[in-house]
């Protein structure tokens, strides 16, 4: 598992680095074999030990091996996790740079900044939950997920249909039958 913190949002005018108006976020990614795995992204008050302690309590397993950078807040917050391995970030060592969690963070930032064109702190946790859910279910073989995916692919954008058109997208013949309740 890899864990890291990051900030999202716009910087204050003229400010450099991590601006105070940015929202602190915490992220963890399960480095499961064969590309499967899950992630969790959470809004936090700050990136201190207290925030990491709560994040660890809610989302991490004490038996996990957690790879992280050498941030002191993480050291204090996750001190009860025996599998915590912290290293200084080294650009020459690809594994020490936490590639999985940084890829998820980068994809999350692109997702919210590209799809929503502006962030609302009020809705940011919902965006994080959506991104985490999509990442965690990206290779699901669940029948319900497959059906949902197929239905999304059948969607015809309104921009491609005239306002007065009554044409509906043709449903494929292979859609599963609806679920029925036994004894009803």
Question: Model-derived features: where do they sit?
Answer:
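Residue-level recognition of single "structural anchor" positions
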Residues: 1-184
């Amino acid at each position: 598992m890899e864990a890291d913190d990051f900030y999202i949002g716009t910087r204050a005018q003229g400010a450099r680095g991590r601006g105070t108006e940015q929202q602190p976020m915490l992220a963890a990614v399960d480095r499961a074999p064969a590309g499967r795995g899950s992630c969790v992204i959470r809004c936090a008050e700050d990136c201190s030990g207290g925030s990491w302690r709560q994040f660890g309590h809610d989302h991490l397993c004490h038996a996990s091996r957690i790879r992280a950078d050498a941030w002191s807040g993480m050291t204090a917050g996750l001190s009860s996790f025996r599998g915590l391995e912290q290293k200084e970030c080294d650009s020459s060592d690809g594994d020490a740079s936490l590639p999985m969690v940084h890829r998820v963070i980068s994809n999350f930032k692109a997702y919210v900044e590209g799809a929503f064109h502006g962030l609302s702190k009020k809705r940011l946790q919902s965006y994080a939950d959506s991104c985490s859910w999509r990442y965690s279910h990206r290779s699901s073989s669940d029948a319900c997920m497959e059906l949902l995916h197929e239905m999304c692919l059948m969607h015809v954008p309104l921009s491609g249909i005239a306002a007065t058109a009554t044409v509906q997208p043709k449903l494929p013949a292979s859609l599963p039958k609806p679920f029925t309740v036994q004894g009803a």
